From Swiss-Prot:
GO MF annotations in UniProt: structural constituent of nuclear pore
A single Gene Ontology CC term: nuclear pore
Function per UniProt: Functions as a component of the nuclear pore complex (NPC). NPC components, collectively referred to as nucleoporins (NUPs), can play the role of both NPC structural components and of docking or interaction partners for transiently associated nuclear transport factors. Active directional transport is assured by both, a Phe-Gly (FG) repeat affinity gradient for these transport factors across the NPC and a transport cofactor concentration gradient across the nuclear envelope.
Pfam families: Nup54
UniProt source species: Schizosaccharomyces pombe (strain 972 / ATCC 24843) (Fission yeast)
UniProt region (Disordered), positions on chain: 1-124
Subcellular localization(s) per the UniProt record: Cytoplasm; Nucleus
Name of protein: Nucleoporin nup44
Length: 403
């Protein structure tokens, strides 16, 4: 006795000999029930009798599906001929035709039935309920896409979700992911392992593509991480600049200390070396003279003595001292000329002299002009005297020639 939503089902008769179906189920024949006293929505579920010699069957007047649609089992006979009846799905529609066409449904999944009118969309097709019940498969199972055609393209919802995941910084499929590298000591690089929230494949690729063994990959997700890395690099560069400035200042202090301490000590050591060299040379001269006292000079020593005598005479020559004084005077004039500023030199080159600032030069020029004036006066006086003498002689000579 079966109940469906509170209604009493129809009674089932005992099976007779030879009344088994194709898959071994017992096909029972139920009496025709009146309208409204059957299945879930008021219809009576009846099975077509099988195994009889004539293959006769009885059908209910209103069908046996959940929504009142007719569901029939194939009728078999001893001649192994099978007549396919239209199969109905859970929602009362024929599995072979969803568009209104009455097509036959193959019994097994590898059997194919050609539809001359319109291809059936088998992507989401459900397996017939009778076949699932006989094979032990759940009626809610769907046919795989590999058996009934290629997979359908992703839906709009899946595409939108994929785009959302690509922009979500906390999702593993985020598109804004980039591995950077941090430099660490070589002995510590092997101690770094993959963090728990990193992708193993991407981590292995980053480790394989690192430029050297002294760097480790670091994942940056999105623009905030890139900005953090830029700020850290700027901070590190500023730290390096501060350190470089400290190094330059330290080098400056060491250089000043070297110039003040070691340079002075080096100059003192050089002077001491020169004094010691002179003392050693004088000592060597005295030792050599004492060793060869009373001995005749050798030819080379005699030549050296003559050269030394000549040098002594040249040093004591007064002409040399006069020449030295002249050279010293020229050097003094050169030094004095260097003391004149560049402006004064340019003014002198242009002929412009600031007499208020160059009183010494004015006195020098005055003295030179005075000397020139005296010289010119003397020349004029000589010329006048010579002219008077010439005129006198000419005067005396002309009368004598006339006489």
């Amino acid at each position: 006795m079966a109940f469906s939503f509170g209604q009493q089902g129809s009674s089932i008769k005992a099976p007779s000999i030879g009344s088994t179906g194709v898959f071994g189920q017992s096909n029972t024949t139920k009496p025709t029930a009146p309208f409204g006293s059957g299945s879930i929505f008021g219809s009576t579920n009846t099975n077509v009798g099988a195994g009889g010699p004539t293959g006769s069957s009885s059908a209910p007047p209103f069908g046996n599906s959940i929504f009142g649609k007719t569901q029939q089992q194939p009728t078999t006979s001893f001649s192994n001929t099978t007549t396919n009846a239209p199969q109905s799905t859970v929602f009362g529609q024929n599995a072979a035709s969803r568009t209104g066409n009455s097509n036959t449904q193959p019994l097994f999944s590898w059997s194919t039935v050609n539809n001359p009118t319109k291809p059936v969309d088998e992507t989401n097709a459900t397996i017939p309920s009778s076949l699932l019940l006989s094979s032990g498969i759940s009626p809610n199972a769907t046919v795989s896409n590999a058996q009934y055609g290629p997979a359908q393209p992703p839906s709009v919802e899946e595409q939108v979700q994929k785009i959302l995941n690509a922009w979500n910084l906390n999702h593993p499929d985020c598109a804004f992911q980039r591995f950077f590298y941090n430099k660490v000591p070589v002995e510590q690089a092997a101690l770094y392992v993959k963090p728990p929230n990193y992708n193993q494949q991407k981590w292995d690729e980053a480790v394989a593509n690192r430029p050297s063994n002294s760097v480790v990959p670091v994942l940056a997700v999105g623009f905030p991480d890139v900005q953090k890395r830029i700020n850290m690099q700027i901070q590190q560069v500023n730290t390096y600049r501060i350190r470089m400035r400290e190094i330059v200042e330290t080098l400056g202090r060491l250089s000043n200390k070297h110039d003040l301490d070691f340079s002075i000590k080096l100059a003192e050591a050089k002077n001491r070396h020169v004094r010691l060299s002179e003392r050693i040379l004088r000592l060597a001269i005295k030792v050599h003279v004492l060793r060869h006292r009373g001995y005749a000079l050798k030819p080379n020593e005699e030549e050296l003595r003559k050269k030394l005598d000549d040098l002594t005479k040249s040093l004591n020559n007064p002409e040399i001292f006069g020449r030295l004084n002249e050279i010293w005077a020229r050097i003094t004039l050169i030094f004095e000329g260097e003391k004149i500023s560049e402006d004064q030199r340019s003014n002198l080159a242009k002929g412009v002299v600031d007499w208020r600032k160059n009183s010494d030069q004015l006195e020098v020029i005055t003295d030179v002009l005075r000397d020139h004036q005296v010289g010119l006066s003397y020349v004029v006086k000589l010329m006048q005297e010579d002219l008077a003498t010439l005129n006198k002689q000419l005067t005396e000579h002309v009368p004598q020639s006339q006489k």
